[in-house]
Amino acid sequence: MFLGFREHEMRSNPCIIGGKGRNMKVLILSCNTGEGHNAAGKAVKECLERRGHQADMVDMMLLKGKRTSKVIGGAYVELVKHAPRIFGLVYKAGEAIRSAKRKSPVYQANKLLAKSLKDYLDQENYDVIATPHLYPAETLTYMKKKGWLKQKVVAIGTDYTCIPFWEETACDYYVIPHKEAVEEWVSYGLPREKLCPLGIPVKPEFAVEANQEKARSVCGLPADKPAYLVMSGSMGFGKIHIFAQELSRRCKDGEQIIIICGNNRRREYAMKLQFFKNPDVHVLGYTSHVAVYMEACDVIFTKPGGLSSTEAAVKQIPIVHTAPIPGCETKNVEFFTSHGMSIGEKTIEKQIRAGQFLMRDENARVKMKKAQRENTNPRSGYEIVTLLEKLCQNVSGNS
């Protein structure tokens, strides 16, 4: 059972018990600020649809227009990519001013979208709302205070920490990544009875039992050669071209390197030019088969994003975390390394050494995979669906 839950705990935990009643129409409300939040939302959407429910996923900023979504999402991503230290200072400032007793500038900004969101909800007939992002939770909290919101709201945390300003929201439940996170969230003023340590949701394909031989065949990789996976992420990986060059220089005996560049076309093109003469380095752009590539590889290098790290841990691939973006990623890598789920290093040389250590030491890989199994919940998405179903049942029963 996930995270040490025993049967009697499950029976008494309102975050888990429940069951399917009528089919629901669910709104998943996110924002275009990095792919982690969206990936969590898509995971819940897929689980809802597999259970026979209707689910719509909406970028809240789009309700104000494409320009608003592009400006806010673009500004966030550019700040993280090109000025991570400034982002870290902003994050620290948020930690310094956070309080459950007063509203932050972030709340004041997000309440400006309340009228647009109200108009949208008035046109639709959603039974319940889930949000994997703080910003919609802020807007929904303002709407709730104004009496504009009839739906129950489930918030989903996508990092292994309570990021600033969750404490000023008023959602009905908060899905958090691990039972050990409960005390931190409570310390910031979140009600204990509203915290559900169900884990970060990932798509069901990541929970499929690994078959490396089949995965390597699908990916066109040699069946008998060790393979590294390098995930550049939607918001960058530092000096990935230098990292990849150094890793390829140190690889031996036909070891394979797969580099996934995501939607960054410029990076994909540059790296294909960089390695076009090296048949052991495979550079990809966007792919919808990340789970298969994880399955095909022996070790992954990735930034410590909460969602991408959870995907790798659920897939049970040994992880080397590269230097975090200051803020929540620092907390993510601290959680993973303290639980034996990854190795975290800040310099390229140490990161590559850590990857080579994991590649050569089977006992270390086995130990890390065991820690990953013990600290993740592959069925988080479905358990969130059960929670949403229970909320709808309660609303129907009280109406």
Region roles according to the model:
Residues 172-227, 231-234, 266-267:
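A nucleotide-sugar donor-handling region in carbohydrate enzymes
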Residues 295-305:
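Acidic donor-binding loop of glycosyltransferase active sites
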